[in-house]
Amino acid sequence: MKNKKFIKLPLTPAEKALLRKHKIKLADLHTFTTDELEFLLKATSGRAREIRALAEFQTVPSIGIRFAEDLVFLGYYALKELKNKDGAKLTEEYERRKAYWIDPCVEDQFRLVVYFANTGDASKSWWAFTPERKKYRQENGYPADRPQKAWYETIGKGHKAPDDLLTLKDERS
């Protein structure tokens, strides 16, 4: 698997210093075991597990730190745990746990990580799954218990509303 050059991780200054001391690149962290990271970073096993998971999830094309954090939020710590999962069901679980519905492109990301976990095929990005998601939702809709509040209505989440995104695009033009 080809490593991404840019992996973002929420590391402390001490953890960054230890990685520099051992000449370890962020893009290589997913190749270490949790036990090795625990030792190298002088971290708890839980912290090492989370760092490793965030690094591994970012090896998937077009997946960044925020979505990697979403996967950890759902309790996943390795790509192998996502094998044979259903991207639509993961989306529905995520929305229930967050108590708001999310941007539809996030479902495309769930579909991508499941696909990647099953195949290892790095040739696709999340937007390759948009037609599949649209077809599925047209045929199946969303669950009756889907949260009513949208992600952009949540306070302090750093999300932009669809209208704000259009405004930003217009300002850049």
Please place each PLM-identified region on the residue numbering:
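C-terminal extensions
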Residues: M1-S173
